[in-house]
């Protein structure tokens, strides 16, 4: 008889044990999701910084050839119509100017407000607003 009782006690997990395991799994899933989301935002910031560095190189090459900064980022891809640029040696970028990692255009201004003797080039970051910190921080070529 005692053998039969022991056998019944080992048939499965109790509801409490299952709830504890489920709670632990939910905590782990939440932690992993938060870490992945942070890494995704970090990667977007890194891509925006790399894009800006690449544009800076192309803009500097444009200036070397034409003795002036381009009127827009699109001028890196196609010679501006109506401008007399006998030394234009582009395209200075291989593909069309991409959007920033959040789907908005990079902002370019020559002469710059912050770099008055050259140009400002930046992305407004995740929030699309000037300023911000952390994931919402702007990616700038003057900091």
Please annotate each region the language model reported:
Residues 14-23, 44:
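Conserved coupling/switch loop of ABC ATPases
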Residues 13, 31, 71:
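Short beta-to-alpha loop/turn elements within the nucleotide-binding domains of ABC transporters
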Residues 19-35:
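Alpha-helical hydrophobic helix detector
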Residues 30, 38, 64:
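Short, conserved catalytic or interaction motifs in soluble domains
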């Amino acid at each position: 008889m005692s053998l039969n009782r022991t056998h019944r006690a080992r048939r499965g997990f109790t509801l409490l044990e299952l709830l504890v395991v489920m709670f632990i799994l939910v905590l782990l899933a939440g932690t992993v999701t938060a870490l992945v989301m942070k890494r995704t935002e970090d990667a977007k910031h890194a891509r925006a910084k790399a894009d800006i560095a690449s544009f800076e190189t192309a803009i500097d090459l444009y200036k070397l050839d034409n003795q002036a900064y381009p009127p827009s980022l699109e001028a890196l891809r196609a010679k501006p119509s109506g401008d007399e640029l006998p030394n234009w040696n582009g395209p200075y970028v291989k593909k069309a100017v991409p959007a920033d990692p959040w789907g908005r255009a990079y902002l370019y201004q020559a002469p710059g407000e912050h770099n008055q003797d050259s140009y400002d080039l930046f992305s407004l970051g995740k929030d699309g607003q000037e300023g911000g910190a952390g994931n919402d921080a702007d990616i700038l070529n003057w900091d």
